[in-house]
Amino acid sequence: MGRAARWFKGIFGMKKSKEKENCVSGDVGGEAGGSNIHRKVLQADSVWLRTYLAETDKEQNKHAIAVAAATAAAADAAVAAAQAAVAVVRLTSNGRSGGYSGNAMERWAAVKIQSVFKGYLARKALRALKGLVKLQALVRGYLVRKRAAETLHSMQALIRAQTSVRSQRINRNNMFHPRHSLERLDDSRSEIHSKRISISVEKQSNHNNNAYDETSPKIVEIDTYKTKSRSKRMNVAVSECGDDFIYQAKDFEWSFPGEKCKFPTAQNTPRFSSSMANNNYYYTPPSPAKSVCRDACFRPSYPGLMTPSYMANTQSFKAKVRSHSAPRQRPDRKRLSLDEIMAARSSVSGVRMVQPQPQPQTQTQQQKRSPCSYDHQFRQNETDFRFYN
């Protein structure tokens, strides 16, 4: 028994020494190759891998020694069983060669001893085999778990290396492309500057329009048609404007800030004036039909939405072109002076109009006047026209 165990230990001891030499040589070569291939791997990961490989080698050696001991025990049991079988064979052969001289009692005793001894040897061999199978299962399970852990650790190291490389690339891209924020700031500044320029140009054009209104001729045009036809024409004009009226209204807000421009309302109509005259109210003449406010509202300040407002033709330029062009032929309308208009209204309504002497206007009243109408051309206050029954 002892000789067999020593023999097995000697064999496995030689194998272990050879395996250690091979492992040492393989580790040296692997470290040299790894240093040449993986130069960019972090130092902490490389140290961890080295320690992990050393620990795994030690554990493998321990398990190999345990397996060798188990196999040696099984071999000892097999040798003992063989020796017992040889002894039984010798006893049986000696009894047979002695002839039939022995008693039956001795034969029965010999058979009984042999059966008991064979059963003992069989049970011992079975126990050894069971222990060997269990040891093999444990070793195989440990090896499988070890391989899985190695693969997981290698994946973690690979992911760390990839993340480090990606972070370096991102840093390089950020270093080589630092001008995006500056370009955005320049764009915003240029937009603000262009808006300021457009607002200043519109203010200048409004100033020119006001200067032109002061020198415009004092002519009033009156339509002899009914109010229904006038409302129809206004509806047609608004429908022809279409969706552009929204954008024109926005431009109108920029060109006429505050309450400087006032539209003619129902209070400026002749019917309302006659009804108010019955109640001894004062009356102010309405602004002409073609006023600067209406032109600014119903005529686009620029032909297209894509063109900026400061490149459009101003109202003073349009008025100059209109003055140089040929006059329109309007047979349905006639031009009357202010006296004829007021006389016609007084004759129709049956009231008497008294016109007092004009009074000079103060500077505050002139500032309150709308720069978009022709009211400042007549130089009359609210008390200029009085209606009596």
Swiss-Prot record:
Region (Disordered): 347-374
Chain ranges of the IQ domain: 106-134, 135-157
A single GO molecular function term of this UniProt record: calmodulin binding
Keyword Cell membrane annotated: yes
Annotated localization: Cell membrane; Cytoplasm, Cytoskeleton
Record-linked SMART domains: IQ
Region named Calmodulin-binding: 137-151
UniProt entry keywords in alphabetical sequence: Calmodulin-binding, Cell membrane, Cytoplasm, Cytoskeleton, Membrane, Repeat
One GO cellular component term: cytoskeleton
Keyword Nucleotide-binding: no
Function: May be involved in cooperative interactions with calmodulins or calmodulin-like proteins. Recruits calmodulin proteins to microtubules, thus being a potential scaffold in cellular signaling and trafficking. May associate with nucleic acids and regulate gene expression at the transcriptional or post-transcriptional level.
Family label: Belongs to the IQD family.
Self-association and partners: Binds to multiple calmodulin (CaM) in the presence of Ca(2+) and CaM-like proteins.
Protein name: Protein IQ-domain 26
Protein's organism: Arabidopsis thaliana
